[in-house]
Amino acid sequence: PSLAKQLPLLKAYQDKAVIFCADGALSMLEKKGIVPDYVTNLDFTDLAMKFFQNKENLKQSIIALECATHPNIVRSLNAENCMIVLRNKALYQRFNLNDFGYIDTGTHVSHFSYTLA
């Protein structure tokens, strides 16, 4: 409900701010012509594929997928504007991909968006 109230303000300032969007809110922004700079997802099931139906609008956004995102979601998206983010956990740090870094993605997409910002 609070997002719906803020959509006109977000639309007015979309070119003056970086917009992070949880995948579940993507359709709401699309309906108002708001293009997020980043779209985040950390779903381990493929139920979230429904949020990524409008591939044309996604071309202008960077899609940040948490390393546990379901493979079907990863495959369905354009690799050019996607990035896989590793959790800040010992299991993932063992991959020794330190040049890429690690993020505390948390357990929900709003935490992931906040940490990424």
What are these regions (language model features)?
Residues 27-116:
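Acidic/Gly/His-enriched mid-domain segments of enzyme catalytic cores or analogous surface patches
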Residues 19-20, 107:
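Short alpha-helix boundary/capping motifs
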Residues 10-11, 20, 54, 98:
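Generic alpha-helix detector with strongest preference for long hydrophobic helices that associate
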Residues 1-19, 26, 36:
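N-terminal glycine-/serine-/threonine-rich phosphate-binding loop
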